[in-house]
Amino acid sequence: MARKTPIERYRNIGISAHIDAGKTTTTERILFYTGVNHKIGEVHDGAATMDWMEQEQERGITITSAATTCFWKGMELAFPEHRINIIDTPGHVDFTIEVERSMRVLDGACMVYCAVGGVQPQSETVWRQANKYKVPRLAFVNKMDRTGANFYKVYDQMKVRLKANPVPIVLPIGAEENFTGVIDLIKMKAIIWDEASQGMKFNYEDIPADLQAESQKWRENMVEAAAEASEELMNKYLESGELTEAEIKFGIRTRTIAAEIQPMFCGTAFKNKGVQRMLDGVIDFMPSPIDIPPVPGHDDDDKEVVRRAADDEKFAALAFKLMTDPYVGQLTFVRVYSGVLKSGDSVFNPIRGKKERIGRILQMHANQREEIKEILAGDIAACVGLKEVTTGETLCDPDAIITLEKMIFPEPVISQAVEPKTKADQEKMGIALGRLAQEDPSFRVRTDEESGQTIISGMGELHLEIIVDRMKREFGVEANVGKPQVAYRETIRKPVSDIEGKFVRQSGGKGQYGHVVLKIEPQEPGKGFEFVDAIKGGVVPREFIPAVKKGVEDSLPNGVLAGFPVVDVKVTLTFGSYHEVDSNENAFKMAASLGFKDGCRKASPVILEPMMAVEVETPEDYAGNVMGDLSSRRGMVQGMDDMPGGGKAIKAEVPLSEMFGYSTTLRSMSQGRATYTMEFKHYSEAPKNVADAIITSRAK
């Protein structure tokens, strides 16, 4: 099958933003203008096409990134047809993992900001993730029709808060209820949309007289930014003071793809203005799969190899999301980096060393789907029939093995016990939790050995709430949940050496004998566990050393203070002894475990608690109370900024254990006018009185 759209006309973009910036509405409008949706879905009615899980429609927030495909020929139908694959990403901080996953497979991102709220805390998180994967991006300032809308304030905030380099390509005409359209700085014309056609039709008009000087100033700013793309353009600009339309587009595109600048657009998605011009910007300035460097990976021998984005290259793709569909079972969303994949093909998963067959391939449009025979380089689609693959794993041609860089997922910070309401729910709950954990790598399930309870862990209260909700809706499992528990950790503060661990049972017959001497040291935070074998002269035979390591590893999940997992320790095996007959692996495992526990007791063990970065946005009248309350929760207030629409943004670091039920307190303290976001920052040592209370409550 020949390609319908050449690869240079593909755009894989994500749309990401803060919770209420109007991201889903913006995506809806894109689908409407590109002719996919005939009736615009409104989030206000809970009918948006992209938000297709029931909870999303009820809560009006986007949780899973739906992937959808649409086609665009430009506002004036002047472009050849381009194919845009859009990934709608969630804006809630508990779902940061979803954003991270989609950033990984995108070629560009459209950042939506609210013209009133400006650059909010979540916007900073998303920006950091986009920096991490060097994603080219453009900005769309939405909600220009709202009271307090200010395009230029958002421009300033992007520079200050995000250290971004925004370059406006359009300017707003008016603001709030007087917002009527935009000035296109490339064409130097005003664009006025026709309201009756829901913005499908528009007119070019002359720039209003009172905006002439301002437009000229911002046009020069834009042309200058374009000229910096190359020496050639710079020389031309310095000589003639002007560049052609094609040169401006080339310059802005080059620098956007290099992530040096971010073109800026504005409008109001809800009132059908400005999204169309931003879509043209996606085509003009966002990269196609061949504009970005070929994707690197490693082959069987761990040598670096690259795959070009071309159909004649060997097949390589990344599975970036799993979803369970009620009709077809498990869907695996893949981004094809190179080659072609046909339904019925076999693919190899190098991480699991397994070969699997692709059943059907579906092109997704939010919650509708179309079956296709093949997907080509640069495409995003969903495959049916893959059993073993999980998020972040590579799929490749069995004859040309490549492992693409794996995604790294954060450790959960909050846990809850769940138990099924009836015996009949027991088995269903196991299946449901297994499926959900497969879909979402930041969600974990385990069984507590002592109590036999099922423990679920995730990135925040809302995260776990939605998991329990999905169990009920999608799998029909009724469950009771316990109180949220904080995921504490233990570590040590001082190094100890010459710690002996001995396990000896010799009472006639075959005995047990294992003896080790360990040195235990603290590691810097986040370094994890490290084991070093420093045995000289075979005092512990080679074959028993893995058993020593295993003995220590088996002791890590249960620390000596309160049974929490031990982190950031380095254990060195320095000496030991063995018995010709009685030594075996089990004896050395036991000896290492005993030695490690004894060593930890002597190495000043401490309890670590998760600290959260909390940002509260509040009207000024309540700022004092909010700060006082955060301090009473052992919070460290780190600063207070003014917000563009008035009010204060207070940043603080607060232990997670003190934040349960905070939303209720904040609501009553501010009469429902303050909002907050919270994300995990790092672990830090719990003060002695807190640690003592934790240890006492665990001992009960």
Swiss-Prot record:
Gene Ontology cellular-component terms listed: cytoplasm
Xref: InterPro entries: EFG_II, EFG_III, EFG_III/V, EFG_IV, EFG_V, EFG_V-like, EFTu-like_2, G_TR_CS
Domain tr-type G: 8-290
PROSITE patterns the record matches: G_TR_1, G_TR_2
Subcellular location: Cytoplasm
Primary localization class, coarse: cytoplasm
GO biological process: ribosome disassembly
Keywords of this entry: Cytoplasm, Elongation factor, GTP-binding, Nucleotide-binding, Protein biosynthesis
Gene Ontology molecular functions: GTP binding; GTPase activity; guanosine tetraphosphate binding; translation elongation factor activity
Binding-site positions, GTP: 17-24, 88-92, 142-145
Function of the molecule: Catalyzes the GTP-dependent ribosomal translocation step during translation elongation. During this step, the ribosome changes from the pre-translocational (PRE) to the post-translocational (POST) state as the newly formed A-site-bound peptidyl-tRNA and P-site-bound deacylated tRNA move to the P and E sites, respectively. Catalyzes the coordinated movement of the two tRNA molecules, the mRNA and conformational changes in the ribosome.
Family that this chain belongs to: Belongs to the TRAFAC class translation factor GTPase superfamily. Classic translation factor GTPase family. EF-G/EF-2 subfamily.
Protein's name in the database: Elongation factor G
Native species: Methylibium petroleiphilum (strain ATCC BAA-1232 / LMG 22953 / PM1)
